[in-house]
Amino acid sequence: MMSLADGTRPMLKVVADQHGNPTSTTAVARQLRNILAKPDLVGTFHLTCEGEATWFEFAQEIFRLAGKTQAVSPCTTDEFPRPAPRPKNSRLDKMMLRLAGLPPMPDWHDALAEFMKSEFNS
């Protein structure tokens, strides 16, 4: 997203009908440490940040944190064709984390702010 906000596009269209859980690799790594500290745990653990967002909402937050004034307009998946189909809902349930008594994943806003600060000093 940051490379798209280079000032050459007056308006960016970003998909607003696909929902997911934006997640940083740092948040995943921290939770993996918690899981690995409990060798008796078995099963599939979904490691996604708390909260949900569309790609449009995610882009808006990225630009806000970066102090960019890039104009962003929502569009539909049909208006933004991709080589492979994308799911409308890629949200994952973190029930296994709760059942294992592990700490929750951070909210995606907080994880994104941490990433932006470390990568872009924003």
Feature locations, PLM:
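NAD(P)-dependent short-chain dehydrogenase/reductase
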Residues: M1-G20, T26-A27, R33
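Residue-level signal for alpha-helix termini/capping positions
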Residues: A5-G7, L36-D40, F120
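Hydrophobic residues at beta-strand termini and immediately following loops
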Residues: V14-V15, L47, C75, W108
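Short glycine- and hydrophobic/aromatic-rich loop-to-beta-strand nucleating segment
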Residues: N21-T23, S90-R91
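Non-catalytic, hydrophobic alpha-helical segments
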Residues: V28, L32, L47, F58, ...
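Mid/C-terminal beta-alpha module of Rossmann-like enzyme folds, strongest
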Residues: Q31, K38-A84, K88, M116
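C-terminal amphipathic/interface module of NAD(P)-dependent oxidoreductases
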Residues: A53, K88-S122
